[in-house]
């Protein structure tokens, strides 16, 4: 079992980050993968939507993957099925700027989380970033 971030203080610290890349961000209002990043965007976070099937979300162009994101990223928030987390973590590990990986509700991959932790970064699994922001920050 990995030592994912669970304390309120650790989660609050991650939520103090400025730039969040959202892998699997949706352009469809009403979907959690759109509404959660929209909530974060409205609260001043620099949200970088990542989705190979969208051209523009929140008024910005959408890169296909983390590999092609030129901006610095603090946190990678994952809205993809658990079986895709490992590939996303591979992209995270190619970057020096990401301090944490956050998987949304229902998304968990212990092996991928262990790799993130071994690289010296933090992991939050199976938690909604919007819910935690409302609970701890808003």
Language-model features: locations:
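Phosphate-coordination loops involved in phosphoryl transfer and adenosine-cofactor binding
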Residues: 16-17, 73
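A short helix->loop->beta-strand "cap" motif at the edges of active sites that frequently abuts
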Residues: 45, 96-99, 119-121
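Rossmann-fold NAD(P)-binding glycine/threonine-rich loop
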Residues: 105-137
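Conserved SAM-binding strand-loop segment of SAM-dependent methyltransferases
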Residues: 60-65
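Mid-chain, well-packed structural core segment of small domains
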Residues: 66-106
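NAD(P)-binding Rossmann-fold cofactor-contacting core
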Residues: 21, 26-30, 37-58
């Amino acid at each position: 079992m990995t030592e994912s971030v669970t304390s309120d203080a650790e989660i609050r610290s991650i939520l103090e980050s400025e730039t969040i890349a959202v892998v699997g961000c949706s352009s469809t209002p009403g979907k959690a993968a759109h509404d959660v990043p929209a909530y974060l965007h409205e609260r001043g976070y620099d949200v970088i939507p990542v989705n190979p099937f969208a051209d523009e979300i929140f008024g910005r162009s959408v890169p296909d993957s983390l590999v092609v994101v030129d901006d610095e990223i603090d946190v990678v928030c994952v809205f993809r099925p658990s079986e895709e987390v490992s590939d996303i973590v591979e992209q995270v590990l190619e970057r020096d700027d990401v301090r944490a990986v956050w998987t949304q509700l229902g998304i968990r991959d212990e092996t991928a989380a262990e790799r993130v932790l071994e690289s010296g970064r933090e992991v939050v699994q199976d938690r909604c970033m919007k819910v935690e922001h409302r609970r701890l920050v808003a």
